């Protein structure tokens, strides 16, 4: 194709993504669009086609972004090239959403006709507006008995401020309104800007590792073009690679002769090491490099940290490789090696939130067959020492000596909770119990309320989301962003078994709840840790002060079994001998801590308050 033909082709390209709250029908709508444009034959069609991970299908959520090329013949007789970039809806995967949106010019906003706007819909809309995208509202599930499209149309105008007069009424399940959506994409989403005659600039928005072809980059070409045989260069580190293949996904990978301005596709270039490519980097040609890189993404900082250890210590290197491969595919995962006296060698990992942590753990266990122990999640605390230093601490075992601590600050989040009016009391009670500060409350319509609180992140990472869902019968939707660090009365609590600290069981807790938490955890461990041949004290301590204690009674053999009657001194001698043996055992004996003990620390957070 010459330059003129490529420019003509570029005018007919439309790049868009679909944004929605969880369960508002985003993946189903993507399925219908694939069917309507005949991208996938009816034989290959299956529900949630773009959710390629087993985990995504089982949980019914989208975790990874996916990019697909479709051809659509519009009513005006022209054929358009659509690039549909599927995005996750959950708050933990906002980073994936922001990457998807950077590769688009338009976004289809799907809102459930019965439920209306939810907290995460808002969060994703603001991301789209930040990227200057054209937003097309779609009111989905209009065939539900509880659907009220007019109320939702009004909500879109009032809450988000979008003109919803032309919003498409659709039902992705029944296939109603799909063609109207496609026509609106043609009319309203602008063609990609950019010049095919300029030096190549392509934004890497994702990458996957292939055992045969190395790292495969998913890119959006902003300027210029790339074809097999070219030598590409990474603009962040200057490394060069020879392109072996370029192509598109339909969802299957299909090779092409070139990728030109406006295209979304993949580049394979025999990139062997995972570290050579970074999501958000710009690819250019080594022979004619671009003057400057594209504006990438803001780096996401992990919010929740936990230790991951292999149950079998010889799997340590396998775990490292698995984490490196996951990091390639999930740029927001961070990890570094750490050791624990109780658990051996492992990694300290940083996650965006609890669902993210859960998903990473499941992917490690499923895709790489590694059995893991996870320690209790913690957040990043700012510890101001008496020397005037400020330490960032994410691991309780790294906390300095209490005598050297001047003050501790913890991260607070701005939590936005949308909930039906009748559950406002339950939400406020929960937020207060989690040390939340009330900020404001707005009525979205007659029935739904948007409540905003400042809550410590440490309280949210435990089980806030589960408690919120159960106290509102699943009707609440929740979104949060980091607001600020505030001073708090926090202490580090150590758990001692038989007088020895178990580093993996340490945690940070607010002083007001310290006694309660310590007592609860000691009682719980007493039930879980098996009885030994000697008595084992379990203690919860803050510094040198013991705040709770419970003893596991010793197992004892009946040494008097073979004494039938007889002299009492004989019995006493046997009992004294047993007692001396137990004493010696207690002095040198160590206690095995079962894995359930570590998990129980996670789940024990609020049991006392049920």
Swiss-Prot record:
Primary enzyme class: hydrolase
Role, per record: Required for accurate and efficient protein synthesis under certain stress conditions. May act as a fidelity factor of the translation reaction, by catalyzing a one-codon backward translocation of tRNAs on improperly translocated ribosomes. Back-translocation proceeds from a post-translocation (POST) complex to a pre-translocation (PRE) complex, thus giving elongation factor G a second chance to translocate the tRNAs correctly. Binds to ribosomes in a GTP-dependent manner.
Keyword terms, alphabetized: Cell membrane, GTP-binding, Hydrolase, Membrane, Nucleotide-binding, Protein biosynthesis
Coiled coil feature spans: none
GO terms for MF: GTP binding; GTPase activity; ribosome binding; translation elongation factor activity
Protein name: Elongation factor 4
EC number of this enzyme: 3.6.5.n1
Reaction(s) catalysed by this chain's protein: GTP + H2O = GDP + phosphate + H(+)
UniProt subcellular location: Cell membrane
GO BP annotation list: positive regulation of translation
Any one Gene Ontology cellular component term annotated for this protein: plasma membrane
Domain tr-type G: 11-193
Membrane topology: Peripheral membrane protein
Homology family: Belongs to the TRAFAC class translation factor GTPase superfamily. Classic translation factor GTPase family. LepA subfamily.
Main localization, broad class: membrane
Pfam family, one: GTP_EFTU
Ligand binding (GTP): 23-28, 140-143
């Amino acid at each position: 194709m010459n330059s003129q033909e490529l420019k003509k082709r570029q005018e007919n390209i439309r790049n868009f993504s679909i944004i929605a709250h969880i369960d508002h029908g985003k993946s189903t709508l993507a399925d219908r669009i694939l069917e309507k444009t005949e991208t996938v034959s009816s034989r290959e069609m299956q529900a949630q086609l773009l959710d390629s991970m087993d985990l995504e299908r089982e949980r019914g959520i989208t975790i990874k972004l996916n990019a697909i090329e479709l051809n659509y013949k519009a009513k005006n007789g022209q054929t358009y090239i659509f690039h549909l970039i599927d995005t996750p809806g959950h708050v933990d995967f906002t980073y994936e959403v922001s990457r998807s949106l950077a590769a688009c010019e338009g976004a289809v906003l799907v809102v459930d006709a019965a439920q209306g706007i939810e907290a995460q819909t808002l969060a994703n809309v603001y991301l789209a507006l930040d990227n200057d995208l054209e937003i097309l509202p779609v009111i989905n599930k209009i065939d539900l008995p509880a659907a009220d499209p007019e109320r939702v149309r009004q909500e879109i105008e009032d809450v988000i401020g979008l003109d919803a007069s032309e919003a498409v009424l659709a039902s992705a399940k029944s296939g109603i309104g799909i063609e109207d959506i496609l026509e609106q994409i043609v009319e309203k989403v602008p063609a990609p800007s950019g010049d095919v005659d300029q030096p190549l600039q392509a934004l890497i928005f994702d990458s996957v590792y292939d055992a045969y072809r190395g790292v495969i980059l998913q890119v959006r070409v902003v300027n210029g073009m790339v074809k097999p045989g070219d030598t590409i260069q990474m603009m962040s580190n200057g490394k060069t690679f020879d392109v072996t293949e370029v192509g598109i996904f339909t969802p299957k990978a299909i090779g092409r002769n070139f990728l030109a301005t406006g295209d979304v596709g993949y580049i394979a270039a025999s990139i062997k090491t995972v570290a050579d490519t970074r999501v958000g980097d710009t690819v250019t040609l080594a022979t004619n490099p671009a003057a400057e890189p594209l504006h990438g993404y803001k780096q996401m900082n992990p919010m929740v940290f936990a230790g991951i250890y292999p149950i079998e210590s010889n799997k340590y290197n396998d775990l490292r490789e698995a984490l490196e491969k996951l990091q390639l595919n999930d740029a927001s995962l961070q990890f570094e090696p750490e050791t624990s006296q109780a658990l051996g060698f492992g990694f300290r990992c940083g996650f965006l939130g609890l669902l993210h942590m859960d998903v990473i753990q499941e992917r490690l266990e499923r895709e790489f067959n590694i059995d893991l122990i996870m320690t209790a999640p913690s957040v990043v605390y700012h510890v101001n020492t008496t020397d005037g230093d400020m330490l960032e601490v994410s691991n309780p075992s790294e906390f300095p000596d209490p005598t050297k601590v001047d003050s501790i600050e913890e991260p607070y989040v701005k939590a936005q909770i949308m909930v039906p009016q009748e559950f406002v009391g339950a939400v406020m009670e929960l937020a207060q119990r989690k040390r939340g500060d009330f900020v404001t409350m707005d009525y979205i319509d007659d029935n739904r309320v948007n409540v905003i609180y400042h809550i410590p992140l440490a309280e949210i990472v435990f089980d806030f989301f589960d408690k919120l869902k159960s106290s509102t019968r699943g009707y609440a939707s929740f979104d949060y962003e980091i607001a600020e660090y505030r001073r708090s009365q926090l202490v580090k609590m150590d758990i001692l078994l038989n007088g020895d600290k178990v580093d993996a069981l340490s945690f940070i807790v607010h002083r007001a709840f310290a006694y309660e938490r310590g007592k609860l955890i000691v009682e719980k461990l007493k039930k879980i840790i098996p009885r030994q041949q000697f008595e084992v004290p379990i203690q919860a301590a803050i510094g040198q002060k013991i705040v709770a204690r419970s003893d596991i009674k010793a197992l004892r053999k009946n040494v008097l079994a073979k004494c039938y009657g007889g002299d009492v001194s004989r019995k006493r001698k046997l009992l004294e001998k047993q007692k001396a043996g137990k004493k010696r055992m207690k002095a040198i004996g160590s206690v095995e801590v079962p894995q359930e003990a570590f998990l129980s620390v996670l789940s024990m957070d609020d049991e006392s308050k049920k």
